[in-house]
Structure formats: C-alpha cells, structure tokens
Design a protein with these regions (language model features):
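Membrane-interface helix/loop caps of multi-pass membrane proteins
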Residues: 1-188
Length: 188
C-alpha cells in the first residue's frame, strides 16, 4: 500500500449496472424486428416486457435505496422527478409530430388529433381501449401517437407502485413476506 492509495477517498458505489444495457439493446432489437413484420421475429413484443421489467426493477431499487438512506419514500419528490424527466421529451415528440403532420400529411394530423391529450396525460392505453383500437391489429396508417400506450402504462406504474412499496415498508414486513407480497402483486 502506498501512502497515496491509503489517503484516496473511497469511491461511492455506482448505481450503474452495465449488464442492463445489454438487456436494453436486446429489447430494442426485438421491438424493431417485430415492427419490420419479419415472420421469424414474432416474439419481438417480448422486448416491451423486458423494458417494463427493467423499469420496475430500477424504480424499486431507487425507492429502496431512498428508504435505506432516509428511512422513508418521498412520493412527492419522486413524482416531480418523473415529471421533470419525461414531460419535456413527451411534449417535444407530440409538438414535432404535429408540426411534421401539418407540413407533410394533414390527413394524419386529423387522424391523430384525438390522441394528443391522452398521450400528453399518459392515459393513451385506456384511450385506445375505450376507442376499441388494438395496437397489435392496427392496419393501414395508425396514429403516430399510438406507441404512447407503453409509456402510459409505465407512468401508471409510477403512480401505483411507490405508494404500495411505501405501505409495505411502513408495515416493517420481513424480506420473505415482502417478496411474497411483491410476487402476488406482480401476478395480478
């Protein structure tokens, strides 16, 4: 041991998990192959499931780290961070899509107009259900905002999961019991 090595501060433990980048890459490839309508890539929708599982894992890990550091989950701060992270990108995509449709495809703009608010407010999945629209059976030219269904589901997860996790943490359940409850909720 050199004196410099002994004096160097310990590096904080990284929250970054490189293997998850590999999973993300596989998920992206699966989704892209699915959308290319390749007969041998029918399982590509599994990529969306991978994204959902990764998001659930990472958000749970983030919230449990907060509990370990502070002893609580600050729901308001969590939701504000999600809004600050996602809303600018969502608004940008919707505005740019509207602008491009206005310039290049006015018919598509008319078609997507009812999808704008559900996309901006993260209930596009419920909107599609109410309109009897099947994302998976969409023929012809679906709305360019149709894909927002998956982001809507993720945002709804962000609304529901943190309070449930907070309730479990507040009940001081043992790890085995917590695992059983989480698996039960996941099954639902």
């Amino acid at each position: 041991n050199t004196p410099a090595a002994e004096q160097a501060p310990a590096r904080p433990k990284s929250r970054y998990i490189p293997a998850l980048d590999g999973l993300r890459t596989l998920a992206v490839v699966a989704v892209v192959l699915y959308h290319l309508n390749l007969t041998w890539a029918q399982g590509g929708l599994l990529g969306v499931t991978i994204f959902f599982v990764l998001s659930g894992y990472l958000i749970t890990r983030l919230l449990l780290n907060e509990v370990a550091k502070t002893g609580r989950i600050d729901l308001k701060s969590f939701w504000i961070r999600r809004i600050r992270r996602l809303v600018p990108a969502v608004v940008t995509v919707v505005v740019v899509t509207c602008a491009l449709c206005t310039i290049f495809n006015h018919v598509m703009l008319t078609k997507m107009r009812p999808d704008i608010l559900p996309s901006l407010l993260f209930f596009n999945n419920w909107w599609q259900i109410a309109q009897n629209v099947s994302y998976f059976n969409a023929l012809g030219d679906p709305s360019p905002l149709t894909h927002f269904w998956s982001l809507a589901i993720e945002e709804q997860f962000y609304l529901v999961w943190p309070p449930l996790l907070l309730a479990m943490v507040s009940m001081h359940m043992s790890k085995p019991k917590t695992r059983r409850v989480v698996l039960g909720l996941a099954a639902v």
